């Protein structure tokens, strides 16, 4: 199991420069966990894409359904105390720290492309490419 941040889910479901790597990641590790916060973040991404007319409403609804199936039964609440402790120890947002807190709770890694998170939490956060370096 890995923790996947919202951008990883977005890049996996929408065409991106990371698409091939994320397909390989999902094949290697199909068990993706997320804090419940991911839903609001993902909806905000879809709202932006809708407003820029990159996707249609029908496509947005389908993307939510696909995302739901990826993380089915792997949504977790996280401790506010742990999130705030991580915020206090870093310059990351509380949103980002929710993903780190979940990775700590599940004793696994957070896969992210967020440079700040990768820099601030190198023991927990790993990029897509580094995931493959450590898991091959």
Task: List each model region and its residues.
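Residues that scaffold the ATP/ADP-binding catalytic core of kinase and kinase-like folds
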Residues: 11-12, 45, 120-121
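Contiguous, function-dense segments enriched for cysteine-driven chemistry
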Residues: 17-18, 62, 72-77, 111-119
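Acidic catalytic patch
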Residues: 36-39, 59-90, 101
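Entry/capping segment at the start of metal-dependent catalytic domains
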Residues: 42
């Amino acid at each position: 199991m890995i923790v996947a941040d919202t951008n990883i889910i977005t890049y996996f479901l929408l065409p991106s420069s990371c698409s091939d790597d994320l397909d390989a990641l999902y094949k290697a590790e199909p068990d993706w966990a997320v804090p419940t916060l991911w839903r609001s973040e993902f909806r905000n991404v879809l709202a932006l894409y809708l407003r820029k007319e990159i996707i249609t409403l029908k496509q947005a609804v389908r993307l939510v359904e696909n995302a739901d199936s990826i993380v089915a039964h792997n949504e977790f609440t996280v401790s506010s105390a742990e999130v705030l402790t991580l915020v206090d120890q870093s310059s990351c947002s509380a949103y980002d720290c929710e993903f780190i807190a979940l990775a700590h709770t599940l004793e696994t890694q957070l896969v992210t492309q967020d440079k700040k998170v990768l820099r601030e939490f190198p023991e927990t956060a790993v990029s897509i490419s580094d995931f493959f370096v450590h898991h091959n």
